[in-house]
């Protein structure tokens, strides 16, 4: 009788333990499904997975607040030798920030636009100064905030599915997240062209442009990641060696590049002017179908954003990244107070009529005085690192 009682008791405890394990697993699964960002220690690396695939892994303030402290922790950890960042879902690395939420918060008098840009730029700077090898797998759409999470890192791996763009002038903003630093440092006037037109680079062109350091076929990304994770106490040179070997074996996207083979001379000559008006005049004088297409595109953009962007890149070409991010923070706060950003969000993301009514509507009406007001110091509210 006593023995049977013990067995029953053991059986009950076993059932409770089993139920507890199942419940814990379900909780973890639910957390994994709903967590916006996954932060995992795997092999020799810290792995960051942007986990909002239905929203193309759009970057939120909540995600930034999880990534930044973990990045700093892994940077200090002697057992973490590299950091990998990637996007879930196969369509996007990160398509940018939640621009609509920014506009709505500003109209409601909330501080999201101050907090998000400040903390995002501090994270961008931390990525640039990270003492551990940082590998961004930019497979799929990479725009805006996604560019900030990748382009400042030591290694950026593009695939045939990569799509890079900085389309902010079309919504009354400017190419931020350090765009004023990295864009003017691309070959020739390529960065100025990308910034003013929002032109989309695809596949191998993302590597040709210098946005990516390596190109790997997307079907090989998983094995590349596993090989990186399996490295024993790797140095930056060891990581580079693995990336180089996969880059050398890549077969996808070998077609010649129209943008680099046919249009770079035009881009360099037309976009070398010091004013947006003169860039447009250069394009008119060129008169080629490519040039005329760029005129059409530029004429749809916010005139204020175009002038801000050109000055941002010209000034950024001689500044440090921290100086650029400080400048860009000032610009974001001024744009939040202005008309064009909220009008751009309305036309592109809310009503989706694609016909924003810019104010001013003409380049000639955006004065130097207007422009200076965007670049002025915020005093005690300036960005601090």
Curated annotation (Swiss-Prot):
pH dependence: Optimum pH is 7-9 with 3-hydroxyisobutyryl-CoA as substrate and 6 with 3-hydroxypropionyl-CoA as substrate.
Keyword annotations from UniProtKB, A to Z: Acetylation, Branched-chain amino acid catabolism, Hydrolase, Mitochondrion, Phosphoprotein, Transit peptide
Family matches, as SUPFAM superfamilies: ClpP/crotonase
Pathway: Amino-acid degradation; L-valine degradation
TM annotation in the entry: none
Localization: Mitochondrion
Tissue specificity note: Highest activity in liver, kidney and heart. Low activity in muscle and brain.
Enzyme Commission code: 3.1.2.4
Residues modified as Phosphoserine: 233
Pfam families linked to this entry: ECH_2
Gene Ontology terms describing biological process: valine catabolic process
CDD domains the UniProt entry points to: crotonase-like
Residue(s) carrying N6-succinyllysine: 54, 91, 100, 220, 249, 256, 296, 300, 352, 376
Enzyme class: hydrolase
Superkingdom: Eukaryota
Catalysed reactions, as listed in the record: 3-hydroxy-2-methylpropanoyl-CoA + H2O = 3-hydroxy-2-methylpropanoate + CoA + H(+)
One Gene Ontology cellular component: mitochondrion
The organelle targeting sequence, given as a residue range: 1-32
Ligand binding (substrate): 120, 145, 168, 176
One MF term in the entry's GO annotations: 3-hydroxyisobutyryl-CoA hydrolase activity
InterPro entries linked to this entry: ClpP/crotonase-like_dom_sf (IPR029045), ECH_dom (IPR045004), HIBYL-CoA-H (IPR032259)
Location of N6-acetyllysine modifications: 54, 91, 100, 220, 296, 352, 359, 364
Record family assignment: Belongs to the enoyl-CoA hydratase/isomerase family.
Role played: Hydrolyzes 3-hydroxyisobutyryl-CoA (HIBYL-CoA), a saline catabolite. Has high activity toward isobutyryl-CoA. Could be an isobutyryl-CoA dehydrogenase that functions in valine catabolism. Also hydrolyzes 3-hydroxypropanoyl-CoA.
UniProt-recorded name of the protein: 3-hydroxyisobutyryl-CoA hydrolase, mitochondrial
Classification lineage: Eukaryota, Metazoa, Chordata, Craniata, Vertebrata
């Amino acid at each position: 009788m006593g023995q049977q009682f013990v067995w029953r008791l053991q059986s009950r405890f076993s059932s409770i333990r089993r139920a507890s394990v199942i419940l814990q697993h379900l909780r973890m699964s639910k957390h994994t499904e709903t967590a916006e960002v996954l932060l995992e220690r795997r092999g020799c690396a810290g792995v960051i997975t942007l986990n909002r695939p239905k929203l193309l892994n759009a970057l939120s303030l909540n995600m930034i607040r999880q990534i930044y402290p973990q990045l700093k922790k892994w940077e200090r950890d002697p057992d973490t030798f590299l950091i990998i960042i990637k996007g879930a879902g196969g369509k996007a690395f990160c398509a940018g920030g939640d621009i609509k939420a920014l506009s709505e918060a500003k109209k409601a008098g909330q501080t999201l636009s101050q907090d998000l840009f400040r903390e995002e730029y501090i994270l961008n700077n931390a990525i640039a100064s990270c003492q551990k090898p940082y590998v961004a797998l930019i497979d799929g759409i990479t725009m805006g905030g996604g560019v900030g999470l990748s382009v400042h890192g030591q290694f950026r791996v593009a695939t045939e599915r990569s799509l890079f763009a900085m389309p902010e002038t079309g919504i009354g903003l400017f190419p931020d997240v350090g765009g004023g630093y990295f864009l003017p440092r691309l070959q020739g006037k390529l960065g100025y062209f990308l910034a003013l037109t929002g032109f989309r680079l695809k596949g191998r062109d993302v590597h040709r442009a210098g946005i990516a350091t390596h190109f790997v076929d997307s079907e090989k990304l998983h094995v590349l990641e596993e090989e990186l994770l399996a490295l024993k106490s790797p140095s930056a040179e060891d990581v580079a060696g693995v990336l180089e070997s996969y880059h050398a074996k890549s077969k996808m996207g070998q077609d010649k590049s129209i943008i680099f083979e046919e249009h770079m001379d035009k881009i360099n000559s037309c976009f070398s002017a010091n004013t947006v008006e003169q860039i447009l005049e250069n394009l008119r004088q060129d008169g080629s179908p490519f040039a005329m297409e760029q005129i059409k595109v530029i004429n749809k953009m916010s005139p204020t954003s175009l002038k801000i962007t050109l000055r941002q890149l010209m000034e950024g070409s001689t500044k440090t990244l921290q100086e650029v991010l400080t400048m860009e923070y000032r610009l974001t706060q001024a744009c939040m107070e202005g008309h064009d950003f909220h009008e751009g969000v309305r036309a592109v993301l809310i009503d989706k009529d694609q016909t924003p009514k810019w104010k001013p509507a003409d380049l000639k009406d955006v004065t130097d005085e207007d422009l200076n007001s965007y670049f002025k110091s915020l005093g005690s509210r300036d960005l601090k690192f």
